Amino acid sequence: MFARDIGIDLGTANVLIHVKGKGIVLNEPSVVAIDRNTGKVLAVGEEARSMVGRTPGNIVAIRPLKDGVIADFEITEAMLKYFINKLDVKSFFSKPRILICCPTNITSVEQKAIREAAERSGGKTVFLEEEPKVAAVGAGMEIFQPSGNMVVDIGGGTTDIAVLSMGDIVTSSSIKMAGDKFDMEILNYIKRKYKLLIGERTSEDIKIKVGTVFPGARSEELEIRGRDMVTGLPRTITVCSEEITEALKENAAVIVQAAKGVLERTPPELSADIIDRGVILTGGGALLHGIDMLLAEELKVPVLIAENPMHCVAVGTGIMLENIDRLPKRALR
């Protein structure tokens, strides 16, 4: 049995793993539960996520990646090791080649941390590739042609925006404004307006079920429960789409500005291609209601959501591993 090539989308919110010949075989939250007293890892992924906010004092649920980069090296390594062992892709004789994605503007120290975590969890050769490039490939864009393609990849910790041509990034921007910040903004809005404390999972729920960033695009209501800050007792309130648009207005504007900045730095010939082809949205944040309409209105170009936007990066790693020998050597650090 030979080891298989594996592609990893190491996200702030989720880890997805693509195995050559099998497709996406793992999609779990990037969460690790540890015992605070002993430092022992108790659970990883889905099991650990279900413990968030519901554990006794000695058990903490940690998200080892923050804003697209490793915040806790040892725990990231433990998490990767757990996921790779779960797949059983290592054979007795050989270790797998791993392609792992990172945001466009991370430092060489942060790159080294990602590479080492992957090597220690059992990779033979570890390739690093920039996330928006891999997302574009996974979304089916022809990035190796001499024409302009623009991708906006909205993850949990970062939004990566890039214009690509001839298989490389022409202009790009990576900002720490993405899904997690939207959740926090909703949580703070409810706290300010209703004096009600809610958890991260509730605010994500609100975002998905009633949230929109395009004014008037949605009118739904949701009943939520939390703890009253005045009485300390549980209380139920109803929130509507309009309030969430208000709460997320400034955050959405940050993404719009970053996308405008990338377009402004794009050579005119490539800009013309983007007007024809449109901008492709990938990542979990592409599913945020109204983000496509908002970007289309502000950028004055067509905006399309990729098919299965959450899977684009993982699928892209698979395609890149198939063609690893044809890729520019400079890209594979």
Curated annotation (Swiss-Prot):
Q: What does this protein do?
A: Forms membrane-associated dynamic filaments that are essential for cell shape determination. Acts by regulating cell wall synthesis and cell elongation, and thus cell shape. A feedback loop between cell geometry and Mbl localization may maintain elongated cell shape by targeting cell wall growth to regions of negative cell wall curvature.
**Which residues take part in binding ATP?**
12-14, 156-158, 204-207, 284-287
User: Which Pfam family is an annotated match for this chain, by its short name?
Assistant: MreB_Mbl
User: How does the annotation summarize its subunit structure?
Assistant: Forms polymers.
Q: Which residues form the signal peptide?
A: none
Q: Does the keyword Nucleotide-binding apply?
A: yes
Q: Which residues cross the membrane?
A: none
Which Gene Ontology BP terms does the record give?
Answer: cell morphogenesis; regulation of cell shape
The name this protein goes by in its record = Cell shape-determining protein Mbl
Q: Which GO molecular function terms does the record list?
A: ATP binding
Q: Give its localization.
A: Cytoplasm
Cellular component terms per the entry's GO annotation: cytoplasm
UniProt similarity note: Belongs to the FtsA/MreB family.
Where is it predominantly found?
cytoplasm
Q: Does the record bear Phosphoprotein in its keywords?
A: no
Name the InterPro entries for this protein: ATPase_NBD, MreB, MreB_MamK-like
Task: Note the NCBIfam families from the entry.
Answer: mreB (TIGR00904), PRK13927.1 (NF010539)
Q: Name the species this protein comes from.
A: Bacillus cereus (strain ATCC 10987 / NRS 248)
Tell me the keywords, alphabetical order. Answer: ATP-binding, Cell shape, Cytoplasm, Nucleotide-binding
